[in-house]
Amino acid sequence: MLLLVVGILAACNSENITLDNEKKNETETLKTGVIFTTDSPIADAKRQLIDIEAKGNGTQTRTSITHTPGQGADASWNSDDFIWVKNKNGEWKQSIGITLHHGGRRADFILPGSASDYANGCEVRYTGTSITYNGFTPTPSDISFPKVQSRTIANDFSKAGEWGDCGSGTARNMNSSGKFNFTLNHKAAYLCFLPRCENAALAPNVRLKKIKITATRGTNTNVLFFANRHNFDGENIYDMGHPILSPDITITLPDFPLYTSVSQEHNATYLVVAPDNYDFKIEYTIKDPTTNIETTFTNNITNITLDKGKIYDVTANLTPKSLNRKHYMWDALQHYWWGHESDMPIVDYTQGQNFPVSKANDPQRYSNYNFPGYNIRNDAQTEFFKTIPNVNEMFWYAYKGDPHWVTDNGTYEDRGHLIQVNMGGIWLKKKSKIMTDEGITEEQMRNGFPKISPTDWRTTMGTWPSNVIPSTNPVPNTTEYFYLPALGGFAGGLLYNFGSRGFYWTSNGAPYSLNNVYMLSFTSSLVQVGATSYSEGIIAKVFE
């Protein structure tokens, strides 16, 4: 089959290959007949990048492809490849032997009969063996893009002929010597999937299991027949309305690793498709073997033109949402489980070990709370806690932030692994949206609530507003709102309300209490500003 090998073959690129070395590198089939050779120089195969946000164009070559992203491609043949040549009687003849030169960069094919059987300028085709997937024997006019495919090696296109690769060319009789020369032009298009996972803790612990591509629109292709049997006329590829509906192709993979950046060597996966202008839905399935959790990422690419003989690099960032569970005692220098992350429980109402117990024993993780006296402003002193909302700002978020509750039974990253969590949370208006909608300045938002006769809650306890019931309708948009997950809290190392209730510190102690600090609290049925003990472990976060 035609070999699309990935990687640079140094010996093949040398311009100083001696005759002896050439002989050593030849793979020869001893048969008699007419020689059709591809001894023209390596052709340039253009490549293009298809990122999730981008689409491109490019150009291509003669035989098969040694592909390096960003550097085009080279060409090579394999020992089981064959070609078709049309003789003077209009009959297609299949080659009966092949001799490889220069590691496959050149090849001599043996055709049956004599040179006089073939016209100068006769047509040559390559169709591989893909049609056998549909139960047919290879012909010069049939190919297939198998609906179900598998790969055993990353960064390898050595079975392109089984996946639908095809091409054609014109053979010329060289100086009436009886030996014909041809250059093959590829007529299929090629996708090279290059996924990554940008979470450095998670990437080493997950594997790429499957890629599924669905054609949702095609300009010249009936996408119901995107896969399986197609007709090839030497120039164009046409779907044949195969009776099996097949708008998608699935590639199963043997646990390819993922890295934080593109790693062609370790996980590049190739696919052959019919040229056209498409909309694609591409689904990548990854698995964490430790937790046995799988998740699928879906990327949609629209209006992408795939031209004949061109390679398109398709990148994708397969990074799931992270819980980022950094609970703090109020005004602590470090988070609750700092240095003891592996002790942090994930199951609700279970207790972890090595939680902070006193300022003397855990000066980094324990609260810096000091009560200055009643009705005296008590601001956080650590640099991080100075950046989180103060209590007045939190009132605006809670009572004028138009909260929307959502529940996501989804997959998250937690401490370098995938976990399945039934996670609730709320969407709130961003500060800029609140100020615009309420007609207030940032200074007003910082110094009191409500707008009329405001109370500065840092020093005074005013009239508490009624709890807000969050909407369960979809959030109007995600550009003017931001999301807060319900990550629960810790008391004495015990996790509580994980996934069902959210607690977020403010930067102010409550002026009416010896040991309480203001916080935002929410569930599916209420949103409020309240207060809790400084020794609780809840989330501290800079709000948008």
What role is predicted for each listed range?
Residues 421-544:
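C-terminal, surface-exposed recognition/capping segments
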Residues 1-399, 405-408, 422:
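Sec-type signal peptide cleavage vicinity
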